From Swiss-Prot:
Keyword rRNA-binding: yes
Assembly, per entry: Part of the 50S ribosomal subunit; part of the 5S rRNA/L5/L18/L25 subcomplex. Contacts the 5S and 23S rRNAs.
A biological-process GO annotation: translation
Matches recorded under InterPro entries: Ribosomal_uL18_bac-type (IPR004389), Ribosomal_uL18_bac/euk (IPR005484)
Ligase as UniProt keyword: no
Any Gene Ontology CC annotation: cytosolic large ribosomal subunit
Provenance organism: Yersinia pestis
Keywords, comma-separated and alphabetical: Ribonucleoprotein, Ribosomal protein, RNA-binding, rRNA-binding
Pfam families in the record: Ribosomal_L18p
The family this protein is said to belong to: Belongs to the universal ribosomal protein uL18 family.
GO-annotated molecular function: 5S rRNA binding; structural constituent of ribosome
Function: This is one of the proteins that bind and probably mediate the attachment of the 5S RNA into the large ribosomal subunit, where it forms part of the central protuberance.
Protein name: Large ribosomal subunit protein uL18
NCBIfam families on file: L18_bact
């Protein structure tokens, strides 16, 4: 099993458990160059809030979009947007990525900005 297949297998298992809970989830995806975050409704078919380093407003503030500082900026932005929509509590879906580095930086920044998970 290659690295990508193993990550997808981990993500599928975690998503199955989160679906049983019926909670709003904060989904994170990372690539070497960018990081993306979405808040998805409990039914799984509606994206309530999104933020990423691809967005011009976030990317202009950054020197490079693929590091911890960029992830923290996305985490802060996603939390602010979620709180504006009245979403305070989410379940964290790391998409099979290790909770370390950029994924952890995004989660910590979102917590500091007021999102609970």
């Amino acid at each position: 099993m290659d690295k990508k297949a193993a990550r997808i297998r981990r993500a599928t298992r975690a998503r199955r458990k989160l679906k049983e809970l019926g909670a709003t989830r904060l989904v994170v995806h990372r690539t070497p160059r960018h990081i993306y975050a979405q808040v998805i409704a409990p039914n799984g078919s509606e994206i309530l809030v999104a933020a990423s380093t691809v967005e011009k407003a976030i990317n202009e503030q950054l020197k490079y979009a693929g590091n911890k500082d960029a992830a923290a900026a996305v985490g802060k932005t996603i939390a602010e947007r979620a709180l504006e929509k009245g979403i305070t509590k989410v379940s964290f879906d790391r998409s099979g990525f290790q909770y370390h580095g950029r994924v952890q930086a995004l989660a910590d920044a979102a917590r500091e900005a007021g999102l609970q998970f």
